[in-house]
Amino acid sequence: MQSDRHARKGTAAATGDPLIGRLLDRRYRIGARIARGGMASVYEATDLRLDRTVAVKVMHPGMGDDEEFAARFVREARAAARLSHPNVVAVYDQGDEDGTVFLAMELVPGHTLRDVIRKESPMPATRALALLEPVLSALASAHRAGLVHRDVKPENVLIADDGR
């Protein structure tokens, strides 16, 4: 997923993104887009019920029309929500509002592994291992739970500002 963290924030009219400013599920006020991938975009959002900032992953328009794909998205969201690991983003909620299929997740301030590699390359082996150990631990936990990530790449690995 490509990071948009440094993109300018704005309104739907200013950015051309109709989701910005929208209220999903009468609960999530969508803010700035922070990442975009082939199947979905991720936005910073406010959970109005719990008064907290979350990440909302929204499938691109039309992706939810494929019933098999949408069903897999929901199954994987439910499975991911049961996964509790310090190096796995927590899934809080899942929904579908008028064809807008979404996940509400923990917002992890930080950068992608791709960003870290670009900034720190070449890096000592000890640093590379320190970055990869939590990733491998998270993947092992997911696999024990019967989950397969399907898209492990540096752009999809978050390195939190707090180091996790």
Show where each model-derived region lies.
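Protein kinase catalytic-loop region centered on the HRD/HxD motif
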Residues: 135-147
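Conserved short submotifs of the Hanks-type protein kinase catalytic core
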Residues: 98-112, 116
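AlphaC helix of the eukaryotic protein kinase fold
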Residues: 60-82
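Activation-segment/catalytic-loop signature of the eukaryotic protein kinase fold
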Residues: 94
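Conserved N-lobe loop of protein kinases adjacent to the ATP-binding glycine-rich P-loop
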Residues: 46-53
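Flexible N-lobe loop architecture of eukaryotic-like protein kinase catalytic domains
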Residues: 35, 75, 84-87, 100
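Activation segment signature within eukaryotic-like protein kinase domains
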Residues: 131-132
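Protein kinase glycine-rich loop
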Residues: 30-37, 42
